[in-house]
Amino acid sequence: LATGMVLVIITGKIDLSVGSVVALTGAIAAWAYNKTDGSMLSAVTIALFAGVVIGAVQGYWVAYLKVPAFIVTLGGMLGWRGLTYIFTDIQPIGLMDDGFKTITTGFVNPVFMDAKNFALLLGIVVVGLMLTSDWMRRQKRVKLGFDNLPLPLFALKNLFVAAVVMWVFYKFSMDRGVPIIICLIAVLVVAMTYVMNNTVFGRNVYAIGGNAKAAKLSGINAERTEFYVFVLMGVLAALAGVVFTAYMNQAQPAAGNMFELDAISAVFIGGASATGGVGTILGSIIGGLVMGVINNGMSLMSLGQEYQLVVKAVVLLVAVWYDLYNNKKSA
Protein backbone atom coordinates (compact mmCIF):
# COMPACT_ATOMS: atom_id res chain seq x y z
CA LEU A 1 0.00 0.00 0.00
CA ALA A 2 2.80 2.42 0.87
CA THR A 3 4.38 2.09 -2.60
CA GLY A 4 1.16 3.39 -4.16
CA MET A 5 0.34 5.88 -1.42
CA VAL A 6 3.68 7.64 -1.89
CA LEU A 7 2.71 8.51 -5.49
CA VAL A 8 -0.61 9.92 -4.33
CA ILE A 9 1.07 12.05 -1.66
CA ILE A 10 3.82 13.21 -4.03
CA THR A 11 1.10 14.69 -6.26
CA GLY A 12 -0.25 16.55 -3.22
CA LYS A 13 -3.31 14.31 -2.83
CA ILE A 14 -4.36 11.66 -0.30
CA ASP A 15 -6.27 8.38 -0.46
CA LEU A 16 -8.34 7.43 2.58
CA SER A 17 -10.13 4.56 0.88
CA VAL A 18 -7.35 1.98 0.56
CA GLY A 19 -8.38 -0.03 3.61
CA SER A 20 -11.92 -0.43 2.29
CA VAL A 21 -10.58 -1.30 -1.17
CA VAL A 22 -8.43 -4.02 0.43
CA ALA A 23 -11.55 -5.49 2.04
CA LEU A 24 -13.69 -5.36 -1.11
CA THR A 25 -11.07 -6.74 -3.51
CA GLY A 26 -10.08 -9.41 -1.00
CA ALA A 27 -13.70 -10.54 -0.81
CA ILE A 28 -13.93 -10.55 -4.62
CA ALA A 29 -10.74 -12.64 -4.80
CA ALA A 30 -12.11 -15.21 -2.33
CA TRP A 31 -15.44 -15.39 -4.16
CA ALA A 32 -13.72 -15.77 -7.55
CA TYR A 33 -11.37 -18.44 -6.21
CA ASN A 34 -14.31 -20.53 -5.02
CA LYS A 35 -16.37 -19.95 -8.16
CA THR A 36 -13.53 -20.96 -10.50
CA ASP A 37 -12.80 -24.21 -8.62
CA GLY A 38 -9.58 -22.96 -7.09
CA SER A 39 -8.09 -21.07 -10.04
CA MET A 40 -5.63 -18.69 -8.40
CA LEU A 41 -4.86 -16.91 -11.67
CA SER A 42 -8.54 -16.16 -12.32
CA ALA A 43 -9.11 -14.97 -8.76
CA VAL A 44 -6.10 -12.63 -8.77
CA THR A 45 -6.94 -11.28 -12.24
CA ILE A 46 -10.56 -10.53 -11.30
CA ALA A 47 -9.49 -8.85 -8.05
CA LEU A 48 -6.89 -6.69 -9.82
CA PHE A 49 -9.44 -5.71 -12.47
CA ALA A 50 -11.78 -4.63 -9.66
CA GLY A 51 -8.93 -2.51 -8.30
CA VAL A 52 -8.48 -0.88 -11.72
CA VAL A 53 -12.19 -0.01 -11.86
CA ILE A 54 -12.20 1.39 -8.32
CA GLY A 55 -9.06 3.45 -8.98
CA ALA A 56 -10.46 4.71 -12.28
CA VAL A 57 -13.72 5.83 -10.65
CA GLN A 58 -11.94 7.75 -7.91
CA GLY A 59 -9.27 9.06 -10.28
CA TYR A 60 -11.90 10.44 -12.66
CA TRP A 61 -13.62 12.35 -9.87
CA VAL A 62 -10.33 13.77 -8.61
CA ALA A 63 -8.51 14.48 -11.89
CA TYR A 64 -11.29 15.50 -14.27
CA LEU A 65 -14.22 16.56 -12.09
CA LYS A 66 -11.83 18.42 -9.74
CA VAL A 67 -13.45 17.14 -6.55
CA PRO A 68 -10.85 17.24 -3.73
CA ALA A 69 -9.17 13.88 -3.22
CA PHE A 70 -9.90 14.02 0.49
CA ILE A 71 -13.65 14.13 -0.17
CA VAL A 72 -13.63 11.55 -2.97
CA THR A 73 -11.60 8.99 -1.03
CA LEU A 74 -13.50 9.67 2.19
CA GLY A 75 -16.64 8.79 0.26
CA GLY A 76 -14.80 5.77 -1.13
CA MET A 77 -13.81 4.67 2.35
CA LEU A 78 -17.49 4.56 3.31
CA GLY A 79 -18.88 3.34 -0.01
CA TRP A 80 -16.43 0.51 -0.69
CA ARG A 81 -16.78 -0.70 2.89
CA GLY A 82 -20.55 -0.69 2.50
CA LEU A 83 -20.28 -2.67 -0.74
CA THR A 84 -18.03 -5.16 1.06
CA TYR A 85 -20.70 -5.68 3.71
CA ILE A 86 -23.33 -6.16 1.00
CA PHE A 87 -21.14 -8.52 -1.02
CA THR A 88 -20.19 -10.67 1.98
CA ASP A 89 -23.48 -10.32 3.87
CA ILE A 90 -21.20 -9.31 6.78
CA GLN A 91 -19.91 -12.89 6.96
CA PRO A 92 -16.38 -14.18 6.26
CA ILE A 93 -15.92 -15.90 2.90
CA GLY A 94 -13.93 -19.08 3.45
CA LEU A 95 -11.68 -20.50 0.75
CA MET A 96 -12.39 -23.93 -0.70
CA ASP A 97 -8.85 -25.16 0.03
CA ASP A 98 -5.42 -23.98 1.19
CA GLY A 99 -4.11 -23.39 -2.34
CA PHE A 100 -4.67 -19.63 -2.20
CA LYS A 101 -2.62 -19.43 0.99
CA THR A 102 0.47 -20.39 -1.02
CA ILE A 103 0.89 -16.70 -1.89
CA THR A 104 1.93 -15.93 1.69
CA THR A 105 3.19 -19.30 2.96
CA GLY A 106 4.82 -20.78 -0.15
CA PHE A 107 8.50 -20.80 -1.06
CA VAL A 108 10.27 -20.49 -4.40
CA ASN A 109 11.20 -24.01 -5.48
CA PRO A 110 13.03 -23.93 -8.84
CA VAL A 111 13.25 -27.16 -10.80
CA PHE A 112 16.90 -26.68 -11.78
CA MET A 113 18.42 -26.58 -8.27
CA ASP A 114 17.78 -27.02 -4.58
CA ALA A 115 15.66 -24.26 -2.98
CA LYS A 116 18.26 -23.59 -0.27
CA ASN A 117 21.13 -23.24 -2.74
CA PHE A 118 18.90 -21.06 -4.91
CA ALA A 119 18.39 -18.72 -1.95
CA LEU A 120 22.16 -18.26 -1.59
CA LEU A 121 22.61 -17.80 -5.34
CA LEU A 122 19.80 -15.24 -5.44
CA GLY A 123 21.40 -13.39 -2.52
CA ILE A 124 24.71 -13.17 -4.39
CA VAL A 125 22.94 -11.91 -7.53
CA VAL A 126 20.98 -9.30 -5.56
CA VAL A 127 24.11 -8.04 -3.80
CA GLY A 128 25.97 -7.89 -7.11
CA LEU A 129 23.21 -5.89 -8.76
CA MET A 130 22.96 -3.51 -5.79
CA LEU A 131 26.71 -2.86 -5.70
CA THR A 132 26.92 -2.41 -9.46
CA SER A 133 23.97 -0.02 -9.49
CA ASP A 134 25.37 2.05 -6.61
CA TRP A 135 28.83 2.21 -8.22
CA MET A 136 27.39 3.33 -11.57
CA ARG A 137 25.31 5.96 -9.78
CA ARG A 138 28.42 7.23 -7.99
CA GLN A 139 30.42 7.37 -11.23
CA LYS A 140 27.64 9.34 -12.88
CA ARG A 141 27.61 11.84 -10.02
CA VAL A 142 31.41 12.18 -10.20
CA LYS A 143 31.20 12.81 -13.94
CA LEU A 144 28.58 15.53 -13.40
CA GLY A 145 30.63 17.15 -10.64
CA PHE A 146 28.24 16.39 -7.76
CA ASP A 147 29.38 15.78 -4.20
CA ASN A 148 29.83 12.16 -3.16
CA LEU A 149 30.70 10.19 -0.07
CA PRO A 150 34.44 9.68 0.37
CA LEU A 151 35.46 6.36 -1.18
CA PRO A 152 36.21 4.65 2.19
CA LEU A 153 32.77 5.61 3.55
CA PHE A 154 31.14 4.55 0.29
CA ALA A 155 32.86 1.16 0.51
CA LEU A 156 31.94 0.77 4.19
CA LYS A 157 28.29 1.59 3.51
CA ASN A 158 28.05 -0.92 0.69
CA LEU A 159 29.88 -3.57 2.71
CA PHE A 160 27.35 -3.17 5.51
CA VAL A 161 24.38 -3.34 3.13
CA ALA A 162 25.83 -6.39 1.37
CA ALA A 163 26.41 -8.14 4.70
CA VAL A 164 22.83 -7.50 5.84
CA VAL A 165 21.34 -8.72 2.53
CA MET A 166 23.50 -11.86 2.49
CA TRP A 167 22.59 -12.58 6.12
CA VAL A 168 18.89 -12.42 5.22
CA PHE A 169 19.32 -14.79 2.28
CA TYR A 170 21.49 -17.08 4.41
CA LYS A 171 18.62 -17.32 6.91
CA PHE A 172 16.31 -18.16 4.00
CA SER A 173 18.69 -20.90 2.88
CA MET A 174 18.71 -22.39 6.38
CA ASP A 175 14.92 -22.64 6.26
CA ARG A 176 12.95 -23.67 3.16
CA GLY A 177 14.22 -21.13 0.68
CA VAL A 178 12.99 -17.70 -0.41
CA PRO A 179 9.34 -16.97 0.46
CA ILE A 180 7.14 -16.16 -2.53
CA ILE A 181 5.80 -13.03 -0.82
CA ILE A 182 9.37 -11.66 -0.47
CA CYS A 183 9.91 -12.09 -4.21
CA LEU A 184 6.59 -10.38 -4.90
CA ILE A 185 7.49 -7.38 -2.74
CA ALA A 186 11.00 -7.16 -4.22
CA VAL A 187 9.70 -7.18 -7.80
CA LEU A 188 7.12 -4.54 -6.90
CA VAL A 189 9.68 -2.26 -5.25
CA VAL A 190 12.16 -2.56 -8.12
CA ALA A 191 9.46 -1.97 -10.74
CA MET A 192 7.98 1.04 -8.93
CA THR A 193 11.42 2.54 -8.31
CA TYR A 194 12.27 2.20 -11.99
CA VAL A 195 8.96 3.80 -12.99
CA MET A 196 9.48 6.77 -10.68
CA ASN A 197 13.13 7.36 -11.58
CA ASN A 198 13.38 6.43 -15.26
CA THR A 199 10.04 7.05 -16.97
CA VAL A 200 8.18 10.12 -18.17
CA PHE A 201 5.24 9.20 -15.96
CA GLY A 202 7.42 9.15 -12.84
CA ARG A 203 9.01 12.51 -13.59
CA ASN A 204 5.58 13.97 -14.32
CA VAL A 205 4.35 12.83 -10.90
CA TYR A 206 7.20 14.70 -9.21
CA ALA A 207 6.67 17.76 -11.42
CA ILE A 208 2.95 17.96 -10.59
CA GLY A 209 3.65 17.61 -6.88
CA GLY A 210 6.35 20.26 -6.97
CA ASN A 211 4.34 22.86 -8.86
CA ALA A 212 1.16 21.81 -10.64
CA LYS A 213 0.71 25.10 -12.51
CA ALA A 214 4.27 25.11 -13.81
CA ALA A 215 3.90 21.46 -14.83
CA LYS A 216 0.78 22.27 -16.87
CA LEU A 217 2.49 25.24 -18.52
CA SER A 218 5.39 23.00 -19.51
CA GLY A 219 2.99 20.72 -21.39
CA ILE A 220 2.40 17.96 -18.84
CA ASN A 221 -1.10 16.49 -18.90
CA ALA A 222 -1.69 16.78 -15.16
CA GLU A 223 -5.22 15.36 -15.25
CA ARG A 224 -4.16 12.19 -17.04
CA THR A 225 -1.17 11.70 -14.73
CA GLU A 226 -3.30 12.11 -11.60
CA PHE A 227 -5.89 9.73 -13.05
CA TYR A 228 -3.24 7.05 -13.63
CA VAL A 229 -1.86 7.56 -10.12
CA PHE A 230 -5.24 6.69 -8.61
CA VAL A 231 -5.68 3.73 -10.98
CA LEU A 232 -2.27 2.44 -9.88
CA MET A 233 -3.25 2.95 -6.25
CA GLY A 234 -6.39 0.91 -6.86
CA VAL A 235 -4.37 -1.94 -8.39
CA LEU A 236 -1.89 -1.99 -5.51
CA ALA A 237 -4.71 -1.90 -2.95
CA ALA A 238 -6.29 -4.86 -4.76
CA LEU A 239 -2.96 -6.70 -4.65
CA ALA A 240 -2.83 -6.02 -0.91
CA GLY A 241 -6.37 -7.36 -0.63
CA VAL A 242 -5.36 -10.59 -2.39
CA VAL A 243 -2.32 -11.02 -0.12
CA PHE A 244 -4.31 -10.30 3.05
CA THR A 245 -7.01 -12.79 2.04
CA ALA A 246 -4.33 -15.40 1.38
CA TYR A 247 -2.71 -14.66 4.75
CA MET A 248 -6.00 -15.02 6.64
CA ASN A 249 -7.14 -17.93 4.42
CA GLN A 250 -10.53 -16.20 4.22
CA ALA A 251 -12.02 -12.83 3.27
CA GLN A 252 -13.21 -10.81 6.23
CA PRO A 253 -15.71 -7.92 5.95
CA ALA A 254 -13.66 -5.87 8.43
CA ALA A 255 -10.35 -6.50 6.63
CA GLY A 256 -8.16 -3.48 5.95
CA ASN A 257 -9.48 -1.50 8.90
CA MET A 258 -7.12 1.45 9.52
CA PHE A 259 -4.72 0.25 6.81
CA GLU A 260 -4.85 3.72 5.29
CA LEU A 261 -3.41 5.17 8.51
CA ASP A 262 -0.48 2.76 8.45
CA ALA A 263 0.18 3.43 4.76
CA ILE A 264 0.06 7.22 5.14
CA SER A 265 2.24 7.08 8.26
CA ALA A 266 4.77 4.86 6.47
CA VAL A 267 5.02 7.33 3.59
CA PHE A 268 5.65 10.32 5.87
CA ILE A 269 8.09 8.39 8.06
CA GLY A 270 9.89 7.45 4.83
CA GLY A 271 10.55 11.10 4.01
CA ALA A 272 7.61 12.23 1.87
CA SER A 273 6.51 15.84 2.18
CA ALA A 274 3.04 16.88 3.26
CA THR A 275 3.17 19.63 0.63
CA GLY A 276 3.88 17.20 -2.22
CA GLY A 277 6.72 16.82 -4.69
CA VAL A 278 8.99 14.78 -2.41
CA GLY A 279 9.11 11.07 -1.64
CA THR A 280 10.67 7.78 -2.73
CA ILE A 281 9.53 4.18 -3.06
CA LEU A 282 12.43 2.93 -0.94
CA GLY A 283 11.63 5.51 1.73
CA SER A 284 8.02 4.36 1.89
CA ILE A 285 9.18 0.73 2.28
CA ILE A 286 11.49 1.74 5.12
CA GLY A 287 8.61 3.64 6.69
CA GLY A 288 6.44 0.55 6.32
CA LEU A 289 9.08 -1.54 8.10
CA VAL A 290 9.19 1.01 10.91
CA MET A 291 5.40 0.87 11.27
CA GLY A 292 5.59 -2.92 11.25
CA VAL A 293 8.16 -2.88 14.05
CA ILE A 294 5.98 -0.47 16.04
CA ASN A 295 2.87 -2.63 15.54
CA ASN A 296 4.67 -5.86 16.45
CA GLY A 297 6.35 -4.23 19.43
CA MET A 298 3.04 -2.98 20.81
CA SER A 299 1.48 -6.41 20.27
CA LEU A 300 4.35 -8.13 22.11
CA MET A 301 3.87 -5.66 24.96
CA SER A 302 0.17 -6.66 25.03
CA LEU A 303 -0.75 -3.01 24.59
CA GLY A 304 -4.50 -2.51 24.21
CA GLN A 305 -5.97 -1.54 20.85
CA GLU A 306 -7.03 1.84 22.19
CA TYR A 307 -3.45 2.68 23.21
CA GLN A 308 -2.06 1.41 19.92
CA LEU A 309 -4.27 3.87 18.04
CA VAL A 310 -3.01 6.72 20.22
CA VAL A 311 0.62 5.75 19.56
CA LYS A 312 0.01 5.57 15.80
CA ALA A 313 -1.66 8.99 15.87
CA VAL A 314 1.33 10.49 17.68
CA VAL A 315 3.77 8.87 15.22
CA LEU A 316 1.85 10.32 12.26
CA LEU A 317 1.67 13.81 13.79
CA VAL A 318 5.36 13.84 14.68
CA ALA A 319 6.37 12.66 11.19
CA VAL A 320 4.32 15.39 9.47
CA TRP A 321 5.43 18.06 11.96
CA TYR A 322 9.08 17.15 11.40
CA ASP A 323 8.63 17.49 7.64
CA LEU A 324 6.96 20.89 7.96
CA TYR A 325 9.62 22.03 10.44
CA ASN A 326 12.41 21.07 8.04
CA ASN A 327 10.69 22.84 5.14
CA LYS A 328 10.27 26.00 7.20
CA LYS A 329 13.87 25.83 8.40
CA SER A 330 15.27 25.38 4.88
CA ALA A 331 13.11 28.24 3.58
Region spans (language model):
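Hydrophobic alpha-helical transmembrane segments
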Residues: 20-24, 41-49, 71-74, 119-120, ...
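Transmembrane helix-bundle core of multi-pass membrane transporters
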Residues: 77-196, 253
